[in-house]
Amino acid sequence: VRTLTMKFGGTSVGNAHAVSQAADIALDCSQEWERVVVVVSAASGVTDSLTQGALTAASGDGQTYLDIEADLRARHYAVVRELVSSPGGSASLLAMVDEHLAELAAFCRSIHVLGEVTPRAMDTIVSVGERMNAGILAALLRQRGKKSQAVDATQLIVTDTAFQKAVPLMDSTRTRVAERLVPMLADGIVPVVTGFIGA
């Protein structure tokens, strides 16, 4: 069975128009390929902002990460409101954005108190953008009539414990993919997988 894996980088999902185009491309390809997997990055500039929020919190700045949180909320809310037409779908996506940004704020508060950011915390923080984008793109595909589900790569990719420079453990990863991703594909679902993190 042929499987197409597509990767959309930050500029390709950088705003509502770009996310809409990415959804169109994925839909077109799903007509030609039996199985399609979409891998998605954070919107352009988001990972840099997340990194800045964590680093400034560690340096004793208790405000910058809050400003970044507010900016990212406004940016992702705008994308959701422009693209998702159903009130229920829009509300659940806005709640998903809030959940991820609350996690970001909680991490940054802890970092601010401790005065340091661990590699493990940084890995979690910088993944927030792609996790939000995966949820948005999967919802847009569903709205356009395609079964789709956001998938956190931590459910699929097993790595060693060298945070910030982890190496995938391929045998364990293959097992996870066979258990979790392959059944989705067999069911005609387009998984939208986060593009940076593993477990």
Walk through the language-model features, giving the residues of each.
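Nucleotide/pyrophosphate-binding catalytic subdomain
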Residues: 1-199
